[in-house]
Amino acid sequence: MQKRMGEAVARVARKVNDTVENKTDSLDLANCKLMTFPVGIYKAMRSVTEGIHHISLANNELKSITSRFVTTFSQLRELNLAGNYLHHLPEEITSLLHLRAINLSRNRFRRFPEPLATVPALETIDLEENEITEVPTEKLASMASLRSLNLRDNPVGPDVRLLVRPLVPFDLLLSPEKPTPEA
């Protein structure tokens, strides 16, 4: 058990070091079994955080994203948080003025994360395979940059199915309606 943990820590350290040394614009910590975003990464990456535009934390065991994470990586354009245990986002997500795409599929959201509705550059929101029943339709309709909202495999209410062009200027992806069983 300790050996596997040590290997996981070493893998994360290697990925962070590669990003810092090569001054790349992305950090890929997908599939690292992270339960939280390691605090040590903030210090290790402080010289390059402004240049990080893409972060993948997909397929970990994250239960939350902190406001510190959002404010540290303020220049993000793409954020992949798919396959975690997230059920809400910090309000500070609204400060990500350059964020164009966020993948929150396969998480634990029961409601649409409303702070996303005020992220100005957001074009793509993927919330496939969550537990979302409520969607702030009016707020979504006013999102000028939004091009695609994926709500497939969510138990959304019938009002969401009424969101069609030209009422909303984006593509809304939903699972087909299940036929109602006949009595």
Residue ranges and their predicted role:
Residues 1-82, 88-91, 101, 114, ...:
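The feature captures the LRR N-terminal capping module
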Residues 103-110, 116-118, 122-130:
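Extended, charged alpha-helical interaction scaffolds
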Residues 123, 127-133, 147, 153:
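Solenoidal tandem-repeat scaffolds enriched in leucines and small polar residues
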